[in-house]
From Swiss-Prot:
Keywords associated with the record: ATP-binding, Glutamine amidotransferase, GMP biosynthesis, Ligase, Nucleotide-binding, Purine biosynthesis
GO cellular component: cytosol
Any one GO molecular-function label of the UniProt entry: GMP synthase activity
Residues spanning the signal sequence: none
Protein name (record): GMP synthase [glutamine-hydrolyzing]
């Protein structure tokens, strides 16, 4: 019997927290569907979503300032359990009649939490026990404000040396507040605390599993498509691979895969992708040579957003032409949840655009094909789990992500054939050395970036002006936040040496040491 994977659901209201997506991932790991929405979402949208519980994220603001964000007041009146985390706890306390003040000593980092009342959230959870027999937890703090006076109906359920009210609860109304961050790995018992809220307090049934997601996706594809054909664009990445596999599992020979050779793929990628999909998927694969088309469309374009939109436009036009030849009505795309969030295309359209993804905001408005996006609700780690469950090879599943517009957004400014050729070679050297040194699977994404600037160097006995190549490698789980990869200097030196010696047009190699945030993973 098919499970309704969306029946039990948690709503996360985001107060611009750097950890908001991490909260969502933790809830998904518990096995319950959740969505992330802006904290100023309208009442109708929340009621339509019909959550079993609501989580208020942390945030960078100070609650007591008049202009700062507030939780929608009605959520405290609908009988739904609410969990406030950090800023979320503070705004809940403030809005319900408590007091919030600046703390004399801000807490950032590790703290030891003393549990005063373990009921519900802390039941059976401890890292240590105090001499008085009280449960002690190691937690991660990041705050400069504290709840100084509880709202009516609340009691203190935990404290730290610097925060007498480090956790609070109104058991009757099922409102809970945590001053610390249970979603981060630095709070070892955080997963269990969130599970207590989601499973025991909100009484959600954990139906959000890989097996159930696959079953639901197949059913959804079959119901939407019927007997019609679907065209899926392949890029060599995990998202398009899992999309194609899901669609193929749902409708079999009604699927036609199209690999568009844009001229902007990595070195030898066209042959590699064709080999993988014809061997492992057994689906019909058409390769379209569109190199001239893409180069002509991108000529003279330097703006990153324009390049993304042009790439999206050209992809769709190629697919539409192939679809007309084959009488196909549907386009399957590997859009995933982080694409949706970053493109600010949530269900309400609210949010600030970080960058437009070519398969979200970059799609033309007059597109003739109907869209099917089976991965749209999934984070990258969930997509990979699906791929493994579907039997795709691990090398493909854990291949580093590659953007839809390809090397066009790894070349700063205008794209031309010379720049593409240089970048392909540099990127291939970097990836080859990562694999030879067994670092490839220790980082989540790695690539080279071409900078159309010339820097002076010396080759032989002569001065040499050549281009600059930047190397980027990051570690991440969900691609919403990322840390730059601290690769050994000896390794980076070897890669740099090869690039400047094997590519005569390059005179300098630099390494990007910026996290996300503040930077994005891609340079454009």
């Amino acid at each position: 019997m098919l499970k309704d994977i969306h029946q039990h659901r948690i709503l996360i209201l985001d107060f611009s927290s750097q950890y908001a997506q991490l909260i969502a991932r933790r809830v998904r790991e518990i096995g319950v569907y959740c969505e992330l929405m802006p904290c100023d979402i309208d009442e109708e949208t929340i009621r339509d979503f019909n959550p079993h519980g609501i989580i208020l994220s942390g945030g960078p603001e100070t609650v007591t300032l008049s202009h700062t964000l507030r939780a929608p007041a009605f959520i405290f009146e609908i009988g739904c359990p609410v969990l406030g985390i950090c800023y979320g706890m503070q705004t809940m306390a403030y809005q319900l009649g408590g007091k919030v003040n600046r703390t004399a000593k801000a807490e950032f980092g590790h703290a030891q939490l003393r549990v005063l009342n373990p009921a519900f959230l802390f039941d059976g959870i401890e890292d240590q026990v105090s001499p008085q027999g009280e449960p002690l937890l190691d937690v991660w703090m990041s705050h400069g404000d504290i709840v100084s006076e509880l709202p009516p109906g609340f009691e203190a359920t935990a404290c730290t040396d610097n925060s007498p009210l480090a956790a609070m609860a109104d058991f009757k109304r099922r409102f809970f507040g945590l001053q610390f961050h249970p979603e981060v790995t630095h709070t070892p018992q955080g997963h269990r605390i969130l599970a207590h809220f989601v499973i025991h307090i909100c009484q959600c049934i954990p139906n959000w599993t890989t097996k159930h997601i696959i079953e639901d996706s197949i059913r959804d594809i079959q119901e939407k498509v019927g007997k019609e054909q679907v065209i899926v664009g392949l890029s060599g990445g995990v998202d398009s691979a899992v999309t194609a596999t899901l669609v193929h599992k749902a409708i079999g020979d009604q699927l036609v895969c199209v690999l568009v050779d844009t001229g902007l793929l990595r070195l030898n990628e066209v042959d590699e992708v064709l080999n993988v999909f014809q061997k492992h998927l057994g689906a019909k694969v058409i390769c379209v040579d569109a190199k001239d088309r893409f180069m002509k469309a991108l000529k003279g374009i330097s703006d990153p957003e324009e390049k993304r939109k042009i790439a999206g436009e050209q992809f769709i036009r190629v697919f539409e032409e192939q679809a007309k030849k084959l009488n196909v009505k549907w386009l399957g795309q590997g859009t995933i949840y982080p694409d949706v969030i970053e493109s600010a295309k949530t269900k309400t359209g609210k949010g600030h655009i970080i960058k437009t993804h070519h398969n979200v905001g970059g799609l033309p408005l007059n597109m003739e094909l109907k869209l099917i996006e089976p991965l749209r609700e999934l984070f990258k780690d969930e997509v990979r789990k699906l791929g493994l469950e579907l039997g795709l090879p691990a090398d493909l599943i854990y291949r580093h992500p590659f953007p839809g517009p390809g090397l066009a957004i790894r070349i700063l400014g205008e794209v031309n054939a010379e720049y593409i050729n240089i970048l392909k070679q540099a990127d291939a050297i970097f990836i080859e050395e990562l694999k030879k040194s067994d670092y490839y699977h220790q980082v989540s994404q790695a690539f080279a970036v071409f900078m159309p600037l010339k820097s002076v160097g010396v080759k032989g006995d002569a001065r040499h002006y050549g281009y600059i190549i930047a190397l980027r490698a990051v570690k991440t789980v969900d691609f919403m936040t990322a840390q730059w990869a601290d690769l050994p200097h000896e390794f980076l030196s070897k890669v740099s040496h090869r690039i400047v010696n094997e590519i005569k047009e390059v005179s300098r190699v630099v390494y990007d040491m910026t996290n996300k945030p503040p930077a994005t993973i891609e340079w454009e």
